[in-house]
């Protein structure tokens, strides 16, 4: 019995998911303009982990025919995983986060990437719901990274994009990357004193935010100031502060609020004073991009 038979996976097309994936890639020139095919997975996994297990099963099923994904990622709506070839790309995504359903489609690679690049370049107001994805990870970098949206024009926009990304990671990472972490640093460089804030989402643990406070005063007043802003834990050896949040929508919102508050307290006047650095996932291999965050990348050294 094959893995797919054992999982009893079917699709609305009447084909098994591996057969459907192979069919879409084989007949891509005639299928590339067709609407996505809704997938059905039976039996439905237990409710608490149904979304994660359903996604893993679907990824494994498509991989039987097309090999492992070339691009992992997710939008504000749900996961978007891709099997990219030079001519066409098969896409596994979710049309509705509330429903948790999955669908499979194929699109011409060049047209898809040009269209998405245009959407990122011309994004206004950083409405993350209108963007094709918020994060994308290539285990083996083969595709050109997408352009980033313009820098957030104010703190409200940046907070919204941070919250959307962190919420997506809290919901999507485990189903795609297992127990691997994803992280990035935000650097504030004012008065020639770069200050670094680290954001980490771990499927095995929590949503963690750390800030370098080595130039902070060693006093009760400063300690009270930091805890008043929302920091929970001082690490004396390294002189960093940490705050830890549940991997939920509420946790993502609280973390985004703390990040914005701390960046302003560290001297940033606008999001243009920030730089994005050390973006990575897992053991650091591959390429993780965050095109919808609204923070300029770090300048080359």
Regions found by a protein language model. Give the residues of each.
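Short helix/turn-capping signatures at newly exposed starts of structured segments
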Residues: 1-195, 200-208, 212-214, 218-223, ...
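Short, low-complexity cationic-aromatic patches
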Residues: 51-54, 248-255
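Well-ordered alpha/beta subsegment
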Residues: 235-250
């Amino acid at each position: 019995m094959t893995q797919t038979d054992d999982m009893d996976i079917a699709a609305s097309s009447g084909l098994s998911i591996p057969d459907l994936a192979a069919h879409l890639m084989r007949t891509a020139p005639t299928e590339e303009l067709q609407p996505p095919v809704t997938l059905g997975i039976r039996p439905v996994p237990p409710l608490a982990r149904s979304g994660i297990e359903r996604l893993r099963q679907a990824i494994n099923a498509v991989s039987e025919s097309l090999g492992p994904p070339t691009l992992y990622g997710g939008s504000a709506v749900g996961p978007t995983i891709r099997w990219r070839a030079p001519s066409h790309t098969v896409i596994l995504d979710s049309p509705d986060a509330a429903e948790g359903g999955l669908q499979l489609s194929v699109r011409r690679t060049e047209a898809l990437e040009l269209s998405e690049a245009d959407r990122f370049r011309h994004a206004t107001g950083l409405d993350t719901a209108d963007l094709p994805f918020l994060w994308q990870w290539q285990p083996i970098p083969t595709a050109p990274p997408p352009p980033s949206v313009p820098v957030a024009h104010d703190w409200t926009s940046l907070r919204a994009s941070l919250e959307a990304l962190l919420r997506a990671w809290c919901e999507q990472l485990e189903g795609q990357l297992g127990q691997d972490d994803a992280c990035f640093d935000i650097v504030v460089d004012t008065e020639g004193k770069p200050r670094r804030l680290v954001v980490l989402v771990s499927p095995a643990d929590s949503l963690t935010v750390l800030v370098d406070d080595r130039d902070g005063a060693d006093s009760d007043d400063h300690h009270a100031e930091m805890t008043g802003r929302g920091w929970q834990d001082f690490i004396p050896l390294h002189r960093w502060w940490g705050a830890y949040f549940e991997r939920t929508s509420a946790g993502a919102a609280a973390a985004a609020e703390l990040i914005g508050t701390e960046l302003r307290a560290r001297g940033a006047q606008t999001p243009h004073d920030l730089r994005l650095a050390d973006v990575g996932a897992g053991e650091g291999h591959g390429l993780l991009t965050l095109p919808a965050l609204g923070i300029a990348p770090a300048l080359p050294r």
